[in-house]
Amino acid sequence: MAAGLSTIAVTLKPLNRSSFSANHPISTAVFPPSLRFNGFRRRKILTVCFVVEERKQSSPMDDDNKPESTTSSSEILMTSRLLKKAEKKKSERFTYLIAAVMSSFGITSMAIMAVYYRFSWQMKGGEVSVLEMFGTFALSVGAAVGMEFWARWAHRALWHDSLWNMHESHHKPREGAFELNDVFAITNAVPAIGLLYYGFLNKGLVPGLCFGAGLGITMFGMAYMFVHDGLVHKRFPVGPIANVPYLRKVAAAHQLHHTDKFKGVPYGLFLGPKEVEEVGGKEELEKEISRRIKLYNKGSSTS
């Protein structure tokens, strides 16, 4: 509400001389000295008229509260969405973590059971061949270690050379769940399946060695999948293995391979940090490790 001064009226009325005459002299006692006139003067009467007008005017406080109220509502809505997103992300991570752990234990348990039934079935009714058992376990370890050197050689001599047309998909942003480079995982799985099949259904030292070799290739492939596809390229959550110091170092070394700072080195995976240090990339490796630690901590704090 505001009162506006809309009209000011001023009226000037002349003094009526007819009311005064010589017959009626003005007594000086009637008026005080301050109001005595020397002769007749015109008397001015000032009339001021005020018209009060109501104006509809919003309070400044109301105007200020409107944007604050709007901002507050948007902030509350945004905070609510962020909380829901964080809760959903936390739930998904926990689910994937359980799935990763259960699948790891599942595959490992199946491998142990296959070894147990292979020997119990093959040796049923006879003596256990210590040599065959030792050969199976030795070949499983040897095949797993040998696959690291095979992967290093094939990566450098084949995938980055004659088979680059297929492997190039791995060095480009992936579109979809799969890439052409995944064919190499299938080609490595075929001999492992063949060796396991032959070794499981046949008796003797040679079938035992084949079974061990197939088992070693399988275990290497499973470890490669979790570290390379999961930890390095984040194709799926890997859970607590992301915080294992050496595996973090392995992931950092492989990340340098994709930056091409040392002419593609390292070409191996699990021995990649050693390759990087041999070409003088220890400092760059430490920087990449620090970067990954910061990213991991940031992701953990926001989850």
Swiss-Prot record:
A motif (Histidine box-4) lies at residues 254-258. It catalyses: all-trans-beta-carotene + 4 reduced [2Fe-2S]-[ferredoxin] + 2 O2 + 4 H(+) = all-trans-zeaxanthin + 4 oxidized [2Fe-2S]-[ferredoxin] + 2 H2O. Expressed in leaves, flowers, stems, roots and siliques. It comes from the Eukaryota. The chain crosses the membrane at residues 96-116, 130-150, 180-200, 206-226. The keyword Amino-acid biosynthesis does not apply. Its EC number is 1.14.15.24. InterPro entries: BETA-OHASE-like, Fatty_acid_hydroxylase. A motif (Histidine box-2) lies at residues 165-171. Keywords: Carotenoid biosynthesis, Chloroplast, Hydrolase, Iron, Membrane, Metal-binding, NAD, Oxidoreductase, Plastid, Transit peptide, Transmembrane, Transmembrane helix. Disruption phenotype: No visible phenotype when grown under normal light conditions; due to the redundancy with BCH1. Bch1 and bch2 double mutant has no visible phenotype, but lower levels of beta, beta-xanthophylls and increased beta-carotene and lutein. Cyp97c1, bch1 and bch2 triple mutant is paler and smaller than wild-type. Nonheme diiron monooxygenase involved in the biosynthesis of xanthophylls. Specific for beta-ring hydroxylations of beta-carotene. Also has a low activity toward the beta- and epsilon-rings of alpha-carotene. No activity with acyclic carotenoids such as lycopene and neurosporene. Uses ferredoxin as an electron donor. Homodimer. The histidine box domains may contain the active site and/or be involved in iron binding. This is Beta-carotene 3-hydroxylase 2, chloroplastic. It comes from Arabidopsis thaliana (Mouse-ear cress). The gene is BETA-OHASE 2.
